[in-house]
Structures are given as structure tokens and as C-alpha cells.
Amino acid sequence: MIKLIVGLGNPGAEYEATRHNAGFWLVDQLARMGGTTLRVESRFHGLAGRARLWDQDVWLLKPSTFMNRSGLSVVSLARFYKILPDEIVVAHDEMDLPAGSAKLKRGGGSGGHNGLKDISAHLTTQDYWRLRIGVGHPRNAPGGAAGGREDVVNFVLKPPRKEEQQAIDEAIDRCIGPLGTLARGESERAMMELHTGR
């Protein structure tokens, strides 16, 4: 059962439309579906709200600590409401997946994602769900860069091209059903639905 869905991103208008905020976009979509307005919750270091989704109450959270410090926000809300790590889904941008794809997995390393690294450190476990939203990689972009650290930072902190944005939005829409399946406790089925479309 899933009790908390966290979207990773950076706060502020200048970051709103950047690839690094794909997790925020998913949580915004869920908030609209659940008829919930996320409000500033200083004790949780972010914007939070309780939504009625898939016939159950689910907390939605957008940390306002900037990506690399997301763990403080996640652990604050999880501890307050006694939510276990395996009841948490963290949605984040994933450069190793093309724009328009999404993958669901439980546990594993951070894959170089500093937001996940910080969350794992604060939760003292990697045993939480990750919803990886593909945003592509600079080496695969038209006129693509080599993909060094500076190229990667520039890439994720820029808005996607129009066709990429459309593909990412469609991927987010495709995540909603499988997230509902996961929230009901059917993890294998949720992964199959998302990964195979069945």
C-alpha cells in the first residue's frame, strides 16, 4: 500500500519548466485529480496535501529544499505520519530513459541522482519505490553534447523541447493507472502495467 507520493524538483519559477522538475509535474497532476491544493508545510520543508486517490487517502509532497536536500522533507512527513519506506513512491527525472518512457522499481542505488541519494541517507534505507520519468540524455539530444557533468547539469536545468515535453506529459498520464494498482498493494501487476502497457 502506498501512503506518500513525493515529486522531486527544484522550487522557484525559474526551475518550474525544467527537466529536473518532472517529479513535480507528476505530483501536480495527482493533486489536480484528487482535487487537492498543496500548501506550504514548514514542518515538512515543502508543499504537501492529502488527496483522495484510488479510493484511499494519499499524501502528496513537493520538497522545497532543492533537489539535493530532499531527504529532510521526505523523512519529516514520513515520520510524522508513521509512513514506512516501502509505502513511499519518489517520482523523479531519469536521464537514462528516453523522454516519453517511465519505469517503476523498488529499492536500488541512486543512479547518480542526488535527490535519491539524500532521501536514502535520511530514511537510512534504499527500500522505497521510485518512479523514473524519462527525460533523455544530452548525448542523445540533437547536436548532443558529450554528456560530461557540466553538460548533464545544463541539460536537466533547461526546459525540454516541445516534442519532448509532449512525450513526458504522455508518460506521466500513463503512470496514473499503475500508481493506483501499486497503491492497492499489487506491485507486480503495477510494474507490468507500466512497463508493458497491459
Swiss-Prot record:
Its main location: cytoplasm. Hydrolyzes ribosome-free peptidyl-tRNAs (with 1 or more amino acids incorporated), which drop off the ribosome during protein synthesis, or as a result of ribosome stalling. It comes from Cupriavidus metallidurans (strain ATCC 43123 / DSM 2839 / NBRC 102507 / CH34) (Ralstonia metallidurans). GO terms for biological process: protein quality control for misfolded or incompletely synthesized proteins; rescue of stalled ribosome. GO terms for cellular component: cytoplasm. This is Peptidyl-tRNA hydrolase. SUPFAM superfamilies: Peptidyl-tRNA hydrolase-like. The keyword Cytoplasm applies. It is found in: Cytoplasm. The record marks 93 as: Stabilizes the basic form of H active site to accept a proton. The lineage of its organism: Bacteria, Pseudomonadati, Pseudomonadota, Betaproteobacteria, Burkholderiales. Belongs to the PTH family. Its EC number is 3.1.1.29. Coiled coil: none annotated. Monomer.
